[in-house]
């Protein structure tokens, strides 16, 4: 998506440790108009799929997923929680994922009443690096017997291999911007097309 690539080039910052900071428009301050166009792009890509639910992970995927849901007939959005809470009651699906950004493992939890065997799920997230967070969401869907129809990603770090691995497993991954390389010393960002 050219508009997203341009925003990354003009407003993104490359940090040491393969970190791309895009908090001006994606994951701290949210550009809702951009999110709307992202949702439209995913709706076009996944037009042949029967999406009944969108699943993301807290926190940065929530805004993108909610806006995107409007392009899929306002299907429900479920977000996996990263910690047990008194608000989470009843039976749950739980798995553990490793966060590249936070450099630690954490549980991800979804109440069983919100993820079902009849669901056809679109996974959405802001970033895809090594694919661990998405693997956790896939595990939750498998535990529920739900079908993963596709994966929508705002920014994929192509050089970290997570997207390529998921595609090799047969998942339909639609990343709107794929960063091929980035240099923290020069700030240069190269995209895969």
Swiss-Prot record:
Pathway: Purine metabolism; XMP biosynthesis via salvage pathway; XMP from xanthine: step 1/1
Entry-linked InterPro entries: PRibTrfase_dom (IPR000836), PRTase-like (IPR029057), Pur/Pyrimidine_PRTase (IPR050118), Xanthine_PRibTrfase (IPR010079)
Catalysed transformations (reactions): XMP + diphosphate = xanthine + 5-phospho-alpha-D-ribose 1-diphosphate
Nucleotide-binding among keywords: no
Binding residue positions for xanthine: 20, 27, 157
GO BP terms in the entry: purine ribonucleoside salvage; xanthine metabolic process; XMP salvage
GO molecular function list: xanthine phosphoribosyltransferase activity
SUPFAM superfamilies documented for this protein: PRTase-like (SSF53271)
Primary site of residence: cytoplasm
UniProt-annotated location(s): Cytoplasm
Catalytic activity, EC: 2.4.2.22
Example of a GO cellular component annotation carried by this entry: cytoplasm
NCBIfam families: PRK09219.1, XPRTase
HAMAP family noted in UniProt: XPRTase
Assembly: Homodimer.
Annotated family: Belongs to the purine/pyrimidine phosphoribosyltransferase family. Xpt subfamily.
Name this polypeptide is given: Xanthine phosphoribosyltransferase
Species annotation: Bifidobacterium longum (strain NCC 2705)
High-level lineage: Bacteria, Bacillati, Actinomycetota, Actinomycetes, Bifidobacteriales
Gene behind this protein: xpt
